């Protein structure tokens, strides 16, 4: 049996009209709210889960898949995503052939961002392009 981890990043630049996922935009979060501490909180939660597993004698194999989904994980800094991945590695270990993916919005990444992810161990990016047809994008409230 494989051990796989999903890390939810519930932030988006804007809400898409069709989306039913648990997501938040800056407007939803309100004045003064910040995504800045999110990675640290996820890392703390990993430690809590690992402590619980240890207490209950649960020893998972190395992680075979790590998937960052959302929302739009790439609304966080690349260094935050890498820090969370590093915490997975330190907490459970990651298999040598693991698939490590983040969902991304083309509006939130550039070549430097992608390079930082690759250097940090990510080996797959899923760009959620819904359409290239302008009127379809307008209907979906999407930019891509």
Where are these predicted regions, by residue range?
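Local cysteine-cluster metal-coordination motifs and their immediate loop/turn environment
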Residues: 10-23
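Residue-level signal for beta-strand positions within conserved beta-sheet cores that form or flank
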Residues: 1, 17-19, 96-98
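Conserved non-cysteine loop/helix-boundary elements of the Radical SAM core domain that shape
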Residues: 24-54, 61-144
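Alpha/beta-hydrolase
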Residues: 7-9, 129
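A generic fold-level signal
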Residues: 11, 60-61
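N-terminal [4Fe-4S]-dependent radical SAM core
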Residues: 1-6, 56-60
